[in-house]
């Protein structure tokens, strides 16, 4: 029998969703399984085996991943070093003279690369591309050895004005790659060969920061699939909505910073086009976040630069979207001013909402919906639970919200939903009405 199934996999913070499309018959099947945060490749394969029990028929797997997104937001990337031009080790800290709190007297920011691991060498390329000072290969070797001794598993090479003439970076890269024990070497001019030193340094440094976790994840993924005695082509969704090979994703993980949400926007555009709608707003509400994007005249809104978090500037083409912490697993709480707030902390899939009965006693948006009867406790989706614990959800809403605000349990649950809806509608206004659409 010929290979004929194309698999789409979206790994989110709470659930992993799978769609299997049989090209010959047009038959579509879907599956949902809890994400395995400790190793996303485990939930990935479990989900595929739910959608189809014969991997020998799978020809292509298209994967939207949040590994890079989570590593950036949770600051769980690899220990990284930077080798740069003398005098420019603090480019990541100086940024563009912005501050975490615009109206505060002071603010703190810690770059993903520690200062002790940002090393300088004597080299200089001028703005016109002429080389004033050539590199000293021994100096590059010494810096590499120092970074390895400091425990760095990835390195970024960034020379000032490298975009005008990459010769010094190319020579230094050759030396660096001959010494570095793995492939986790990011060269700034290879990743972003254009003017603006902060954006180039930030993008290249974050690429290096992501290389080990993303590469390790993709290698585990390939291993798990090969263990099923099947060699399927795996394509990774990029932040701009396109796809790339696994090898490209390993070397340029920065392009996957918004991989999962971007895939959803592209799908929504195609569905809207087929239905005859050219202007739409997409909303992707998962367990952890709510992602929205605007599509005008059947075209995705693209941006060349985005901040994943303060100081984490990425300059690479990506679909423009806004993300807020208002997913099904977002935790409701009373803030320091006595007001009801939703997120950004999420219960995820483990322990999950209080109604999962796995140890979380704080109310989530899902718990509020269950209390209000909007979710059938006997038929939950996702396959993790045969039923949901209505009493646990009720108790969580009562203990953490209702009693503190002197409300009935029903009114407290209604308030949680209203706050979540207000946050979502505010984000929708931000990308549409406030931009003139």
Tell me the role of every PLM-derived stretch.
Residues 1-437:
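N-terminally biased helix-coil "hinge/interface" segments that flank
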